[in-house]
Amino acid sequence: MTNSDDDLFSEKSTSSDTQQVQNILELEAKIPDILSSAGKCIEAIQLNNSLEDFRKYSKEFLETVEFISTGLRRQALELEKAEVPVVSLQPKKRYASTPLSNLIFDQSSKLM
């Protein structure tokens, strides 16, 4: 571990540091949920041919993505407060103007 890692996990670390680590661990724990929900969406279409199940699992998927996205934005804001160069935080992709949920439901309508 680096010196800053030692500081982060030492007894001297502030409650803010501890909270940031907990937030990151919580976000990391949600990543498998995204894959699980996406898999269930595919199964709902392929195996069950159930639009109701697809909607349920796609809602779970989108809620999990939103949770992670919000958490990552908060982490980025915390980094900005720590005077990290903003250039390193700029997204490299353009964001779609159409919400992801609309795209998913449009595609599911085409499949049904």
Swiss-Prot record:
InterPro entries: Mediator_Med11. GO terms for molecular function: transcription coactivator activity. The keyword Transmembrane does not apply. GO terms for cellular component: cytoplasm; mediator complex; nucleus. Keywords: Cytoplasm, Nucleus. It holds the Pfam family Med11. It is found in: Cytoplasm; Nucleus. GO terms for biological process: positive regulation of transcription initiation by RNA polymerase II. Component of the Mediator complex, a coactivator involved in the regulated transcription of nearly all RNA polymerase II-dependent genes. Mediator functions as a bridge to convey information from gene-specific regulatory proteins to the basal RNA polymerase II transcription machinery. Mediator is recruited to promoters by direct interactions with regulatory proteins and serves as a scaffold for the assembly of a functional pre-initiation complex (PIC) with RNA polymerase II and the general transcription factors. Component of the Mediator complex, which is composed of at least 21 subunits that form three structurally distinct submodules. The Mediator head module, the middle module, and the tail module. The head and the middle modules interact directly with RNA polymerase II, whereas the elongated tail module interacts with gene-specific regulatory proteins. Med11 is part of the head module. Forms a heterodimer with med22. The med11/22 heterodimer binds to and stabilizes the central head subunit med17. Belongs to the Mediator complex subunit 11 family. This is Mediator of RNA polymerase II transcription subunit 11. It comes from Schizosaccharomyces pombe (strain 972 / ATCC 24843) (Fission yeast).
